A protein has these predicted regions:
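N-terminal export signals
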Residues: 7-24
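The feature marks the mature, well-folded catalytic cores of soluble enzymes
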Residues: 26-358
Length: 358
């Protein structure tokens, strides 16, 4: 099975230009927020070498996500050549399968992060290194470059090492990140937080970076922000809120610290942030310790939101209702993704959007 991504190591708009809808100089790049129109979504097919006996179940989850996203927008799924046929059969004709070598399915982290110019798109290659060398990544380390070459999209090689799941934008000049997944020697040896922040601002055209502490060394990602907090729109942060009966551990402490930071922070427009709590499920049954039970790892698609369902009916209904209120006019679809969750990841972790130009 893939290494657990949550509990254990074992198992861009620029604020100075004004508010929403403001004109941007032609020579500036920005990272659009996820709710902006997509050209398509990229995904990747899990390999048996990484997932072992869990492979079939994880592939069912990935195929289910791909088919669902394809109801809203085009999907391109990367697969090793020998497995492309199986991927096509599982995902159906609405999903394009392309033979690009991969190690694992976490396209949010291995794929390029797309930024916009006035009339073009470019891809930031964040130099994926297996979450700091914790997992074999010979193929995944080349995925971003391969995608951009195949699509004939300009590649921007980052001067830092990071993963897409470590970064969250409001599309209006603000970035939200966990320090634990960026300021560490397994990714950026010898680099200070200030140096990394300068690189992030340049890469994504942001002017404000909000840092929360995160958790170092307890999961393979060192606690990505997309399992903790998301922007639903400029000025609104959706936070994965532990239930009252949750144990006092490093994860609840990380939430408490992040909540204090977000409550005090201002965005690139100089405005305070509103926090919307998205409570985690109370009952997750017999799932393992590394199971990722958070609803904020949803994915916003054209006209919809694809989010997890965990089987705690009260919590599932409440989460869907909150997300509908956050994204009015979008269809909310909940999917069971238990096999993916046992690997410590979720729907957002397995997808990567390419923004529409124009």
């Amino acid at each position: 099975m893939g290494i657990s991504r949550r509990r254990t190591l074992q198992a861009a708009a620029v604020a100075a230009l004004g508010g929403v809808g403001c004109a941007r100089p032609a020579d500036r790049r920005w990272w659009p927020d996820e709710s902006q129109r997509h050209e398509l979504t990229y995904m990747a097919w899990p390999t048996r070498r990484i997932w072992g006996s869990a492979t079939d179940g994880v592939r069912e989850d990935i195929a289910r996500i791909a088919r669902t996203v394809a109801d809203f927008e085009p999907v391109t799924l990367l697969a090793n050549r020998a497995e492309a046929g199986a991927a096509r059969r599982a995902c159906g004709s609405a999903v394009e399968v392309v033979p690009i070598p991969v190690d694992d399915l976490w396209m949010r982290d291995t794929g390029p992060t797309f930024v916009r110019g006035a009339d073009h798109v470019a891809g930031v290659d964040l130099n994926f290194n297996g979450w700091g060398g914790k997992q074999e990544h010979a193929r995944d380390g080349r995925v971003a470059r391969a995608v951009l070459k195949g699509e004939r999209v300009r590649r921007i090689k980052a001067p830092i090492t990071a993963e897409g799941g470590a970064l969250e934008t409001d599309g209006e000049g603000t970035l939200l990140v966990t320090e634990s997944s960026l300021v560490n020697d397994s990714r950026n040896p010898g680099m200070s937080r200030n140096a990394i922040e300068r690189a992030l601002k340049d890469l994504f055209g942001v002017t404000t970076v909000i840092w929360v502490k995160g958790v170092l060394g307890e999961d393979i990602t060192d606690y990505h922000i997309d399992a903790l907090a998301r922007f639903s729109e400029p000025g609104v942060v959706v936070m994965s809120t532990p239930p009252e009966q949750a144990p006092r551990d490093v994860w609840t402490a990380a939430y408490d610290q992040a909540r204090k930071v977000v409550d005090r922070a201002v965005d690139a427009r100089g405005k305070r942030l509103e926090v919307v709590e998205l409570p985690e499920p109370v009952d997750i049954g017999r799932r393992g310790e590394g199971f990722l039970a958070c609803y904020v790892n949803y994915y916003v698609v054209n006209g919809g939101v694809v989010m997890p369902r965990f089987g705690d009916r009260k919590a599932d209904r409440r989460a869907a209702s909150i997300v509908r209120d956050l994204y009015p006019g979008r269809e909310v679809v909940q999917l069971p993704v238990d096999h993916l969750g046992e690997g410590g990841g979720g729907i957002h972790c397995s997808t990567q959007q390419r923004p529409e130009v124009g």
